[in-house]
Amino acid sequence: MKKIIIIVFAVLFLSNSHGQTKAFTVKVTGKGSPIILIPGYSCSGDVWNETVTFLQNRFECHVLTIAGYAGTAPIDTPILKTVRDEIIKYTQINKLHKPILIGHSLGSFMSLWVSSTAPGLFGKLVCVDGMPFLSALYDPNANADSLKINPMYNPEAIVKNFENLPDEGFITNTAKAMMMQVNDTARARQIATWQFNSNRRTLGLTIIELAITDLRKNIQSIQQPILVLGSIYLTKENSYKQIGDQFKLAKQVTIHVADSKHFIMYDQAEWLYNEIDSFLK
């Protein structure tokens, strides 16, 4: 009961800090050493439901949903930087002892960002198909400073594009596109529904903030072991090369690639659980 009261207090504190809506919602289940699970772009924390079921008998799982995603109230820009700072505050206020960080996609990026910002505060990291610099995945020569002044990465223009998307057909069309990232049609529709329920401005601002933030040098400061679980980028060999290039400055990194699309927790759940289990032992 005392733990629950502390967590509720922390969430209330974060919601009032700087006069803003809280940067994320939190659902806490299980008992044991703490784990913070961060979902990917536009997703609800429910994307981790099955993973939490696997972990909750041994770990206390703090599952986040980022503000503006999947029906949660949005916050002002800079969104992801605010989320980073408030994850650190949340960990400190709740006196979580070196919580393990597990992130998917954008959530992996956030895990790397918070851990490199506060290196002594967090434990091991599990990055599920996420990179320190998304843009370099598509262009190895990408430069964050150049992208910031590139008209194609203008945040307000991207926001406008999202806001102009019609509601009619949004879920159906997005679900079709999501079949490139997950095998199951029901899962694809759920992911599409989370995106439909997300704040359009948040969708635009966060994808740009993610694209123009390069953490490849920052991760040198992370002292804890990092497990990177990748999906197939054209070929498994190419996946290992792409991931290895991005994490080459990490002090302790293990890279494994699944025979999977992007949502590994859905396409290769047992493989994911085994990898996490072995890494956390």
Annotate each PLM feature:
Residues N161-Q220:
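Conserved alpha/beta-hydrolase catalytic His-Asp/Glu region
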Residues V28-A73:
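Conserved HGGG/HGGXW glycine-rich cap/lid loop of the alpha/beta-hydrolase fold
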